[in-house]
């Protein structure tokens, strides 16, 4: 894997509108926590037997999963997205918190070591298994913890995991380090990942 710096990445859509015709790929781009929400309630998308193809629509997935009522699934996804918003912080609000003098914030970066070493928010730490174990077992449960990834698609799951283990002041950085670079600190280079063929 190589990390490429790129100052012209497309921005993610910020106003999710979903329908039965929305593809699963579009859904996951609009609502990064959608797979988690579908699996938690309907056992869809969590494993090979209940998976879906990115090109399938929500309606098609509902039909082949016991003909689930599409409207009910859409309401559940909307409710889940609202919950996800509550455990996110946007880049400008994070900057305000970091600029406060007596702030004790832990910035945990869950990207690969290669990504982290190429581009990082000052003061952040790469999440290792040892650091995760320390955080969950030894940190004060009131510790303000920010989970950072590349574009915000994986950090929600980790934030929910930390909250589930009692670190209730944990949030995910909405849009990840990419959003932080765009909205707060243009000195942090933007990048894209390319997987080289074997």
Say what each PLM segment does.
Residues 148-149:
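Short, surface-exposed ligand- or partner-binding patches at beta-edge/loop junctions that are enriched
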Residues 1-11:
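N-terminal amphipathic/basic-hydrophobic helices that include classical n-h-c signal peptides
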